[in-house]
């Protein structure tokens, strides 16, 4: 999908998703005391404007689309030296992911599925994971707009993500939810942010015994 079409669609007054995601990411990057942060599915870098360079030792931006990553580098020269963009296909290249203290994954799990996301998190091994998923109150997962047809091919890989199923999938790999926030959108959709923390091994042992 051309980035300009994607961002124009997401920022329409009838959708307002780009603006909402930026505001939510502002709280995500400020929520925890971490030094290495990773944004999976960084796309054009929406929300990176809220990152204070001196707060993080390293910021990883990961995406499958190399042209998106080039745009990120051009848009955020102030993050030069801290920001490292990585072109990685999360379906079959999770072993290339470096370690980080926190992972942010917004509107990503819908396109890679729970199992692939589990593999990525196990590879990165962060203390915190913050996800934003989209819940469709209406019938369509893509809102009507002049740009709707650029999403046609995505329907083949789109998975509907459910809050409780995601929580169960994360618990399987040792992460429990610690925070949930909701943001209503004007198009019969809502964004749900779920934050997870890696459990201490002692806690995991107790769970296994129960």
Language-model features and meaning:
Residues 1-95, 115, 119, 130-210:
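Class I (Rossmann-like) S-adenosyl-L-methionine-dependent methyltransferase catalytic domain
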Residues 101-115:
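A short SAM/SAH-binding and catalytic strip from SAM-dependent methyltransferases
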Residues 124-130:
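Short glycine-dipeptide loop
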